[in-house]
């Protein structure tokens, strides 16, 4: 659908110059789209670095050697933009100020420091974001790096290649997406890696029960994880990093330190010229990417986008929204028309060794922080038919409104299949769907690809059962003291992986439950558990229909519980199904 935005007038023959500040995802997309929509416009792209458009999401994989050819990361060279799109690309040119009244940008040539004024009829700001560099002692030591540009990537790759066999120890500060991707790739390059995270879990955007699987994968691959600690200082000798000291005084030796603790939007240019910021500190835009000055647009990591799951706005430093926003801004700037930017949802994914974590929308923690009432449903199920070779478990969590069932978000972890489930759920979320909509989805199925009852369906069934009063769930991290806890797995399963309940557990296999109801107190609140929750639901229905007053199913069963609440003793563990 094409729509006319505020101030959305096509540039006349007398007003034909579009200036774009910043390249990469937002700016380069804007430039290319603007040219496709207007052959007559003069389009000037200013980029302070030498690389105009590159795949920054691929940089960790070049450092680790998975991507062998550096040139593959260059999405569009300056020369390609000049010849194919007739764009005036000015590399190593920095916009230092904007005069809105005069409609000029002050530009500094970084090669010689000279400056000039550049007039514009429409202006697009795509300044991106900068890595957060904490003001710590030793932070500027040689061997301390952040990763935002190809130059950063080249410096890190050179340090990795030059590191001798006896000095390949790395600290990664921050356990978000970039931090964990870098940890994986440094292990691939033969480094001993330690990850430091200020929060109490890795992947802080996820709920703890899903993030626990990724932490297990890190540990399985030799990565030591330090949670609930930050950096106090970088230790150096002769200007060269020797390690770090954590906030609790722990000293970790290392020859390489990677800072992945977040980014800060580059809004200085916007603030200086009087553009409005949003509540999260990004440039405020409308659905057509116009700022508070309708002749100036903004796109990319410095922008606050409409936030779909809970309303309002949010900064989302992801390539997908930046590309879409740049494309729309470029079209609207030269034609006055474009489709409205849809709200973003933070749909994202990361691979950590043999596991994948993906999410869209709100986690339980984020929903509660936003003041939203929510419930969740978690299942552990095969990513395709169990009888077909290569089946592996996928953990899938839906977050939804407790009365309407409207989907608020979803998370998934597993060796395979997390991506396609989250993509489906992102679509449901974008169109305001509910868990009942998910339960009724018609999805493709053949044994190599899925199950007749997909994990999506199974999670939605759990949610619908709770909405319909057929199966209340208890959060996996709940304190079980005061509950009558019944484990309906077989004796062998219980022995192999005891339920970490912190209280007495009554083991009654499901197939024996009807004959042993007398061993239980029907008036006492009861928690039932199995391996992943399926048999526990059957037990729950039996007990409720035999007059038990309150029966809840422990979300995710013993498998998820043991991730979130570690076993009290070092017993023999194994797969629990």
Each predicted region: which residue ranges?
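Glycine-rich dinucleotide-binding loop and its adjacent helix/turn
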Residues: 125-189, 224, 285-287, 505-516, ...
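Mid-to-C-terminal Rossmann-like scaffold of FAD/NAD(P)H-dependent oxidoreductases
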Residues: 12-17, 302-415, 447-451, 455-483
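N-terminal Rossmann-fold NAD(P) dinucleotide-binding loop
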Residues: 27, 179-180, 536
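Beta1-alpha1 glycine-rich phosphate/pyrophosphate-binding loop at the start
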Residues: 12-89, 94, 183-206, 338-340, ...
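Rossmann-like dinucleotide-binding cores of NAD(P)H-dependent redox enzymes
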Residues: 73-74, 167-171, 177-234, 316-322, ...
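FAD-site-proximal beta/loop scaffold in flavoenzymes
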Residues: 140-164, 236-245, 250-331, 424, ...
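Rhodanese-like catalytic fold shared by cysteine-dependent sulfurtransferases
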Residues: 7, 436-447, 451-484, 490-527, ...
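A Rossmann-like FAD-binding core segment of flavoenzymes
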Residues: 40-42, 84, 90-111, 118, ...
